[in-house]
Amino acid sequence: EGTLTFYSDGKYASSLETHLSTDVPANWVKYQVPCVRLRDYLTEPVDFLKMNIEGAEWQVLADSEEQLRRIREMVIEYHHLPGLPRTLHQILTLLHRQGFEYLINDFDSETNGGVSSPFRLTSQSRFYLLIYARRLD
């Protein structure tokens, strides 16, 4: 709860992540936005949750871990971007711990020009994954 800094290019790209705070592209605008915790909204069963939060997936999932058992299925867009911590393993471990089975699909460079081939992984590589998770109990 409180406010976070949100960066946007005014079109499609945006981020809440602090890796931009020292290297913000000139055409991006910085906003202070109010924020709330997802966990505060997970008080009743949820059929489906879609999460596309531009690199903040791990922080939100970790903060909401105990409430995730109320979700039947979800899709998480995972962002692997230069300057962000690599949190895929933590996310998948958390999902497993909370009783989810999951499938992972990647965005390819043919459908998303901002994506690097996973076969050319470097410290500057960027790729996006869709994690489909479902409780089987």
Descriptions of predicted regions:
Residues 1-137:
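Phosphate/nucleotide-binding beta-alpha loop and adjacent structural elements of enzyme active sites
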